[in-house]
Curated annotation (Swiss-Prot):
Its cofactor is [4Fe-4S] cluster. Belongs to the ThiC family. InterPro entries: ThiC, ThiC-associated_dom, ThiC/Bza_core_dom, ThiC/BzaA/B. Keywords: 4Fe-4S, Iron, Iron-sulfur, Lyase, Metal-binding, S-adenosyl-L-methionine, Thiamine biosynthesis, Zinc. The keyword 4Fe-4S applies. GO terms for molecular function: 4 iron, 4 sulfur cluster binding; carbon-carbon lyase activity; zinc ion binding. This is Phosphomethylpyrimidine synthase. Catalyzes the synthesis of the hydroxymethylpyrimidine phosphate (HMP-P) moiety of thiamine from aminoimidazole ribotide (AIR) in a radical S-adenosyl-L-methionine (SAM)-dependent reaction. The keyword Metal-binding applies. Binds 1 [4Fe-4S] cluster per subunit. The cluster is coordinated with 3 cysteines and an exchangeable S-adenosyl-L-methionine. It catalyses: 5-amino-1-(5-phospho-beta-D-ribosyl)imidazole + S-adenosyl-L-methionine = 4-amino-2-methyl-5-(phosphooxymethyl)pyrimidine + CO + 5'-deoxyadenosine + formate + L-methionine + 3 H(+). It comes from Herminiimonas arsenicoxydans. Gene3D superfamilies: 6.10.250.620, Radical SAM ThiC family, central domain. [4Fe-4S] cluster binds at residues 584, 587, 592. The gene is thiC.
Length: 637
């Protein structure tokens, strides 16, 4: 990508790499109780098991898909028009919102009327919506009224990943179908640390979890383009990807490209953390083209409005920013309302002080005015805005540790307690909440973080940045944090915020975004396996079976990154014939453990004996050969 290329709305195009279907994959839609509930999944077709392994059909497997219409060949993608709006009929039929004449925030009106921005602006013809006076349009409010919304049914179907149909197809696949279904459906019992994961996710279970505050569906009424997803301890672990420009690099086009690239590889949510030029316009382009929820940190943009002087921030400026972003369709706001004046001195003893941008902004404001922040003082006013658009809180950990030296200190844990108190205030308004967490934490202190969060924040979903388990690896912090992410996901964190290799070093590009996503997909999936999430092991079992049967293309295609797997294999064995070979370049044809195992099984079958008997008999034969050869360990050639 070129540095800061000129972006023009009239010539904006989609990233061609992001709209190619993944190998041997088809986008399918599972219909719910009504025709307009169409839940996307990715169907990965497999080849048959070769006759040499006892021929059998291998039905397609189904995996969770976050790429929206971008990987659907039948969808017409034009980022200048944005995506279709599948949620709009659901929002309208509830009859609890009104269409506004246009933006109502001062800043939104100002940007709309600025002729210099015409060539950058996304030309949205739809007007923003807001709750009718006295109404609450949050998914939590509906859940507490006993209402199962289409969004709730959608995520229930999505979480089950068509598992029942897959196992049924296996049973019908041939004479060995029942045995095969049992084999592929088998998984190790997990340790869920008190989570309540059901055998099957139902719409009623989704409703009850949202009503209790243990899960959220981030879904602003002004973001009808999204395919609903759920964040909660009793659901699949999700991942968030951060994108956004800075004052020195990136353009609108590049950020839209990063978003489409992130969701291709499995980003469940995306946060736009832009701090550079045209924040408002960049966000509009991202939201209108995003099928996943979009989050922001509104204080970043508010700071730009006062030329970077934290002490000049006011409640009025911040309130206008919240309304501006809510009317654009932001699904969740990170708000650092837990940074209290009394906590700031506690950070003086730290190795790395306050490392959160939002936290440092609010700490500076508190010290400059010597009082609690307007975020804390106006928290109930913020709740009124959130429930008018169904924006979820992501209560920010402004005092998170920026080094393992500072992990689990009094500032971090004091703020956590305050976030729990704010959670209960938000719930009083039926506003959805998740809690942000650290940060940098050594492995032996990670579980304490999770246990304290569950206790003090009343089981609201936890959303953590890693945590990084060591500070010695700049350039590899996707790995140092992936270790902690897998652990804390197992203990109960609902969503993991990815870290890219560029963490602490620079703004990530597309390659870094993919590396971060894949690392965190691994961590999230490992956590699902460890928790014993029903059906989580099906993909592992399918890949392992393909590996044992030397179905190379199936191995590549079932994996998280088919392109990388195929590239690595082809570096040493590039010919098509190698895709059916019963060995790889690691061990070669004579030392492949799986090939040897297959030979043992074939020998046992021919002799009419068990595999254990075959191994014993083979050892006896080799012993006789050894004695006959002179009992020398090393034979002369």
């Amino acid at each position: 990508m070129n540095a800061n290329p000129k972006f023009l709305s009239a010539t904006a195009t989609v990233d061609e790499a992001a709209i190619q279907p993944l190998p041997n994959s088809t986008k399918i839609y599972i219909q719910g109780s009504r025709p307009d509930i169409r839940v996307p999944m990715r169907k990965i077709t497999q080849s048959d098991t070769a006759a040499s392994f006892g021929f059998e059909k291998n039905p397609a497997i189904y995996v969770y898909d976050t790429s929206g219409p971008y990987t659907d060949p039948e969808a017409k993608i034009d980022i200048r028009s944005g995506l279709d709006t599948p949620r709009l009929p659901w929002i309208l039929e509830r009859q609890d919102t009104e269409e506004l004449p246009g933006p109502t925030s001062e800043y939104g009106i100002e940007r709309l009327n600025d002729p210099k921005l015409a060539e950058l602006r996304f030309n949205l013809h739809r007007k923003p919506r807001r709750a009718l006076a006295g109404k609450n349009v949050s998914q939590m409010h509906y859940a507490r009224q006993g209402i199962i919304t289409p969004e709730m049914e959608f995520v229930a179907i999505r979480e089950n990943m068509n598992r029942r149909a897959y196992l049924e197809e296996l049973k019908q696949s041939g004479p060995k179908g029942e045995k095969l279904a049992e084999l592929m459906g088998r998984q190790h019992p997990g340790q869920s640390f008190g989570a309540a994961i059901p055998q099957e996710i139902t719409a009623e279970f989704v409703r009850s979890e949202i009503a209790r505050g243990r899960a959220i569906i981030p879904a602003n009424i002004n973001h009808p383009e999204i395919e609903p997803m759920i964040i909660g301890r009793n659901f699949l672990v999700k991942i968030n990807a951060n994108i956004g420009n800075s004052a020195v690099t990136s353009s609108i086009g590049e950020e839209v490209e990063k978003m489409t690239w992130a969701i291709r590889w499995g980003g469940d949510n995306v946060m736009d953390l832009s701090t550079g030029k045209h924040i408002h316009e960049t966000r509009e382009w991202i939201i209108r083209n995003s099928p996943v929820p979009i989050g922001t940190v509104p204080i970043y943009q508010a700071l730009e409005k006062v030329n970077g002087k934290a002490e000049d921030l006011t409640w009025e400026i911040f309130r206008d920013t919240l309304i501006e972003q809510a009317e654009q369709g932001v699904d969740y706001f990170t708000i650092h309302a837990g940074v209290l004046l009394r906590y700031v001195p506690m950070t003086a003893k730290r190795m790395t002080g306050i490392v959160s941008r939002g936290g440092s902004i609010m700490a500076k404001w508190c010290l400059a005015h010597h009082k609690e922040s307007f975020l804390y003082e106006h928290f109930e006013d913020i709740c009124e805005i959130m429930k008018a658009y169904d924006v979820s809180f992501s209560l920010g950990d402004g005092l998170r540790p920026g080094s393992i030296y500072d992990a689990n200190d009094e500032a971090q844990l004091g703020e956590l307690k305050t976030l729990g108190e704010l959670t209960q205030i938000a719930w009083k308004h039926d506003v959805q909440v998740m809690i942000e967490g650290p940060g940098h934490v050594p492995m032996h202190l990670i579980k304490e973080n999770m246990d304290l969060q569950l206790e003090q924040c009343h089981e609201a979903p936890f959303y953590t940045l890693g945590p990084l388990t060591t500070d010695i690896a700049p350039g590899y912090d996707h790995i140092t944090s992936g270790i902690g992410a897998a652990q804390i996901g197992w203990y109960g964190t609902a969503m993991l915020c990815y870290v890219t290799p560029k963490e602490h070093l620079g703004l990530p590009n597309k390659v870094d975004v993919k590396d971060g996503i894949i690392t965190y997909k691994i961590a999230a999936h490992a956590a699902d396996l460890a928790k014993g999430h029903i059906g989580a092991q099906i993909r592992d079992n399918a890949l392992s079976k393909a590996r044992f049967e030397f179905r190379w293309d199936d191995q590549f295609n079932i994996g998280l990154d088919p392109d990388k797997a195929r590239e690595f294999h082809d570096e040493t064995l590039p010919k098509d014939s190698a895709k059916v070979a019963h060995f790889c370049s690691m061990c070669g044809p004579h030392f492949c453990s799986m090939k040897i195992t297959q030979e043992v099984r074939e020998y046992a079958a021919k002799q009419g004996i068990t595999e254990i008997q075959a191994l014993k008999k083979g050892m006896e034969v080799k012993a006789i050969e050894f004695v006959k050869s002179g009992s020398e360990i090393y034979q002369k050639q």
